[in-house]
Structure formats: structure tokens, C-alpha cells
């Protein structure tokens, strides 16, 4: 049995794929796994690191705004489709699984042209552009959030996440040497410019009362002297899961994968979603869903001033009962078997 995975651009599209691949291998150890993605994307690095056979194709980013690069990327998509067709014809997979992102579109369309069963997964509450372009060709559409538009293709699976880390290992890795609570601020695999600027202006106030773990995003480390109880990283791979488990509070954007990894670890959080005017509004919708369930606290970006932000974080960390309640509510939103559910759907489609 041969299965092709695709999806990339950010960790939110790649990391769930790795969780699903692990579940597929557990259920069907004989399955051959292949990954089609971009030449320079995070998906190549992570796929090859885990021993997955990877093939690069041309991809074009799907922007919703005017940019001269749109014309160049528009030419890359058909080239990517041809490359994906060539690769799929050679591999002859029984099924293709798409996790979304602009990287996935050429592969999903090539699968449709070759009549290979296509399974897709949408993490966000509202579907992204890649999902909207390819959903009509899918045999099954897996969703992380409940939907008000059920159909025969729809399967509510939850969001696949990596195994929960060890808080003990996380504390050993961070080596703070004190009993202060730990706050983890993470802007995702590519970083969040606003969160980094916010931390530059509030990290000293936070460090008086908390231990701070600051994930800036790859290549975005600030050039500044920091208190000794601040740990600065541009990116963490497997260590992130242990650090997440060790955190007393997490501050994050509201991308679905980040949200569900926080929830799976029962961590309370403060979400600062990417504003709707800077995106399609998916993070705002994700954050509102979690907030309505009592599973987070939301601080809109326009209200996230350094003093107010530090004050909120320190106040929350002083209320252990509130933190426990938020963490428990978050855990209820994250099915522990999402990766296995999706793996079974993929394997059924491959029969």
C-alpha cells in the first residue's frame, strides 16, 4: 500500500501530517509513505528528518491581496501540477492525503486528475483557500471543529497533534533553578512579528514575577540583553512538547495546530489572534470558539499593550484555580485519538 501526503508552508500544516503518518504506520506497518511538498519549506526538513521519502514540486502562494509576486506564483502552480502528476504516476499511490496550505493544491489537483482517492483535513473553524479549491474533489473531508453544514463527505475527527510531552523533562531542559511560574510565549514556526515586539517591551516586567520562555520564530532572535530567567529560542522541535507541558501559561497566536497542541496538554492560554484585517479571520474565529468554551482568554491585538499584557499574565499566574479550570476546558476540545481517526479514514480509502 502506497500513501502520498502533502501540505506545508508552516508547521501548522506539516506537524499534523507527521502525527497522522505515525498513526498510519502503527495501524499498517507495511504502508509505504511518500511526501510531496515545496523545495525550501519546513515540510522537507521535517519529513527527511523522520525518514520519509520526500519529493519537491513547484508551488505558488495563494494570496488574498494584490502583490506582484502573485503573477510569478500563478505560473508555478501549473508547473507544480505537472510535476505532481509525474510523481504520482511513478509512485502509483492508493490514496493521497492533503493537510492544506498552498503547497498542497498542485498535488490535490493532480490526484483528482488521476482519479486517486483524495482525503483532506481542515484545521480551522472556517475553511482555508486551499480547502475550498480542492474540497469538491475529495472523497472525505476531515474537520477539527464541529460544523453546521454536515454532509456525506464530512468527518469530525478533531485535530491531530504530537504526543504530549513531559513537564519534568521540560523543566530540566529549561533549567531555571527557581520556583517561579513559567510562561511560554510562542508565535508559531515562522514567528509572529507583533508578539516579538510585544515581548521586547514587556519581558522585563514579566521576568520580575515569572520565568519566561520566548519562541521568536526561525531567524528572528532579538539583539538585546535579557534577564537570566528568560530562555530565548528561535525554534524548538521535539523539545517544544516538553516545554509546553512544563508551562503554567501559554501565550500564542490562534492558529489551529498551536491551539490544539496547547489544549491536548491541558495548558491554560492567552490568545492574541492575528487580526481579521491581516488575514481571512480564521484565527479570530478559532479564538472565539475556544473562549466561548472557557478554554482560553483572548486579548485582541489592538488591546495588547505591553503594560496591560504583562499585568494580565501576572494576574492569571496568581490564580491557580482559574488556570486549572481553563486548562481542563481546553482539554475537552482536543480528542486524543484524532490522528488515529484520520489514519483509519485514509486506510479505508486505500482499500
Model-derived features: where do they sit?
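A short, well-ordered alpha-helix in the C-terminal region of glycosyltransferases
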Residues: 322-336
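Donor-nucleotide binding loops and adjacent catalytic segments primarily
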Residues: 41, 46, 50, 169, ...
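Glycosyltransferases and closely related glycan-assembly transferases
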Residues: 83-96, 105-119, 132-137
Amino acid at each position: 500500500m502506497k500513501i502520498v501526503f502533502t501540505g506545508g508552508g508552516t508547521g501548522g500544516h506539516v506537524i499534523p501530517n507527521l502525527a497522522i503518518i505515525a498513526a498510519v504506520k502503527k495501524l499498517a506497518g507495511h504502508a509505504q509513505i511518500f511526501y510531496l511538498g515545496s523545495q525550501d519549506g519546513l515540510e522537507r526538513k521535517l519529513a527527511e528528518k523522520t525518514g520519509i521519502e520526500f519529493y519537491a514540486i513547484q508551488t505558488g502562494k495563494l494570496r488574498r491581496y494584490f502583490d506582484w509576486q502573485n503573477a510569478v506564483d500563478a505560473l508555478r502552480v501549473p508547473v507544480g501540477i505537472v510535476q505532481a502528476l509525474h510523481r504520482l504516476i511513478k509512485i502509483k499511490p492508493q490514496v493521497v492525503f492533503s493537510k492544506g496550505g498552498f503547497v498542497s493544491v498542485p498535488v490535490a489537483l493532480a490526484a483528482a486528475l488521476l482519479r486517486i482517492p483524495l482525503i483532506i483535513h481542515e484545521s480551522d473553524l472556517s475553511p482555508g483557500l486551499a480547502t475550498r479549491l480542492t474540497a469538491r474533489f475529495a472523497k472525505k473531508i476531515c474537520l477539527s471543529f464541529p460544523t453546521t453544514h454536515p454532509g456525506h463527505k464530512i468527518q469530525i475527527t478533531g485535530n491531530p497533534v504530537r504526543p504530549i510531552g513531559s513537564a519534568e523533562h521540560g523543566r530540566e531542559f529549561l533549567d531555571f533553578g527557581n520556583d517561579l511560574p513559567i510562561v511560554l510565549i510562542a508565535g508559531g514556526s515562522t514567528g509572529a512579528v507583533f508578539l516579538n515586539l510585544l515581548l521586547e517591551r514587556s519581558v522585563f516586567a514579566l521576568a520580575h514575577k515569572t520565568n519566561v520562555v520566548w519562541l521568536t520564530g526561525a531567524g528572528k532572535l532579538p539583539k538585546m540583553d535579557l534577564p537570566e530567567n528568560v530562555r530565548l529560542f528561535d525554534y524548538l522541535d521535539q523539545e517544544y512538547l516538553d516545554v509546553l507541558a512544563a508551562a503554567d501559561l501559554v501565550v500564542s497566536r490562534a492558529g489551529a495546530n498551536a491551539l490544539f497542541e496547547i489544549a491536548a496538554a491541558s495548558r491554560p492560554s492567552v490568545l492574541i489572534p492575528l487580526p481579521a484585517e491581516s488575514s481571512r479571520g480564521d484565527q479570530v474565529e478559532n479564538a472565539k470558539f475556544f473562549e466561548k468554551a472557557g478554554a482560553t482568554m483572548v486579548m485582541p491585538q489592538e488591546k495588547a499593550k505591553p503594560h496591560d499584557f504583562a499585568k494580565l499574565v501576572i494576574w492569571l499566574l496568581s490564580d491557580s484555580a482559574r488556570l486549572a479550570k481553563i486548562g481542563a476546558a481546553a482539554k475537552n476540545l482536543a480528542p486524543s485519538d484524532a490522528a488515529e481517526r484520520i489514519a483509519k479514514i485514509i486506510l479505508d480509502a486505500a482499500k
